[in-house]
């Protein structure tokens, strides 16, 4: 869904010159520099990520894969070092079939895994830049969107899970390419299927499911705006074709996973209520460490929820997103705002009541552990709404001189 500025809504010449400076190349270079500045030890090899699940889950899994790869077993099916032994490739989250895992398999650990995570952060920022620019047609606003998507509490908290970085890194690209596939068909469907398959191989089923909910919602808005029955039918067929292709391309990973799931201890109510956002957690959107406790390692976690260290998005980002929702009123911004509100309510788990109601209607939702993960859609829509807010600021007329 693209947007073009009409002459009446276009920024002033000085603002146009500023906007023209923020090209994709400059944004990409700037984002890369920002990540290097934020994590110099990881980039230059003098340090490594280690906190929480990165050290006790993520790195050991990758180390086993790395060791197996160099021992002549590039696709290990079994991990003898996990408890008394456990399936490896079938666990999905081990990223065994993710093609770009070759980066950390061929290069030395732990440096390669840390840089691998940062590369996917960069990838996600670039994807959000392209997606936002397609909507608001302003490079400066798209730049803000890309930065907000990368540098927020939720995204940075997810660094401890390398497979989460893959899912988040490809998220904007899935939305962008599937949107184009529904509009253009043909080769665009194949491109969307490949991109979505890359995210599918990350092994984060909750994020993948929510990605497709967002994609379908945005496509529904596009169909409503066009008011063209033939386009609706065509877009629906193209979307279905994309989903079928993704399913086929991912079958080598999905079939073993579902067999493992059927034999595992995971059930509809497995840890369903653990780590939901408490009522006071709303304050964390405005104050980074609201109701947080300091651990012995010097990090902070929220009372009642210790999966995500912080989901603070930044007051500036939230202000722009609010302006985008109320000032740039379109069907899409209304839908994005609705997704944001729904995301927060579901993240509260039973505290928000709606989660329990939906789980009663769809018991399979109980397989999703930790309701706090439902904040992912909020992290996706906030940069887009902020881009709409920035567009409103850039296009508004200056006040009359006294």
What is each of the regions a protein language model found here?
Residues 42-135, 140-170, 280-307:
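Active-site lumenal/periplasmic loops and adjacent helix-entry segments of GT-C-fold
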Residues 26-32, 231-258, 272, 337-342, ...:
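Hydrophobic alpha-helical membrane-interfacial segments at the cytosolic entry of transmembrane helices
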Residues 126-130, 134, 173-180, 215-223, ...:
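Transmembrane alpha-helices and membrane-interface helical segments
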Residues 56-77, 242-324, 359, 363, ...:
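Periplasmic/ER-lumenal interhelical loops and adjacent helix-loop junctions
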Residues 31-34, 123-224, 238-257:
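Membrane-embedded helix bundles of polyisoprenyl
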């Amino acid at each position: 869904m693209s947007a073009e500025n009409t002459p009446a809504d276009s920024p002033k010449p000085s603002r146009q010159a500023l906007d023209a400076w923020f090209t994709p190349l400059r944004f990409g270079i700037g984002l890369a520099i920002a990540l290097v500045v934020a994590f110099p030890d990881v980039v230059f090899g003098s340090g490594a990520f280690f906190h929480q699940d990165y050290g006790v889950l993520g790195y050991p899994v990758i180390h086993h894969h790395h060791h197996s790869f160099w021992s002549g077993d590039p696709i290990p099916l079994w991990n003898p070092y996990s408890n008394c032994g456990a399936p490896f490739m079938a666990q999905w989250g081990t990223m065994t079939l993710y093609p770009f895992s070759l980066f950390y398999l061929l290069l030395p650990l732990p440096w390669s895994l840390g840089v691998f995570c940062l590369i996917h952060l960069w990838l996600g920022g670039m994807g959000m830049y392209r997606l936002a620019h397609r909507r608001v047609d302003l490079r400066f606003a798209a730049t803000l969107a890309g930065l907000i998507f990368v540098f927020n509490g939720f995204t940075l908290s997810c660094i401890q899970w390398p497979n989460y970085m893959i899912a988040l890194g490809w998220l904007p690209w899935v939305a962008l390419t599937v949107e184009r596939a529904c509009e253009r068909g043909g080769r665009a469907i194949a491109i969307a299927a490949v991109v979505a398959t890359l995210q599918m191989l990350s092994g984060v089923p909750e994020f993948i499911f929510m990605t497709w909910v967002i994609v379908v919602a945005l496509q529904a808005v596009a169909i409503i705006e066009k008011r063209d029955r033939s386009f609706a039918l065509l877009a629906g067929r193209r979307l279905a074709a994309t989903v079928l292709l993704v399913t086929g391309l991912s079958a080598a990973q999905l079939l073993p996973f579902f067999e493992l799931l059927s034999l595992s201890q995971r059930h509809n109510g497995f840890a369903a209520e653990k780590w939901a956002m408490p009522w006071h957690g709303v304050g964390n959107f405005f104050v980074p460490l609201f109701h947080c406790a300091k651990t012995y390692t010097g990090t902070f976690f929220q009372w009642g929820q210790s999966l995500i260290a912080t989901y603070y998005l930044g007051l500036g980002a939230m202000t722009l997103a609010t302006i985008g929702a109320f000032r740039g009123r379109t069907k899409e911004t209304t839908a994005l705002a609705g997704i944001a509100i729904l995301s927060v309510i579901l993240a509260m788990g039973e505290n928000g009541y709606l989660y329990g109601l939906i789980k009663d209607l769809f018991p399979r939702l109980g397989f999703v552990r930790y309701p706090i993960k439902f904040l992912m859609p909020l992290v996706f829509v906030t940069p887009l709404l902020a881009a709409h807010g920035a567009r409103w600021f850039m296009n508004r007329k200056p006040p009359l001189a006294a």
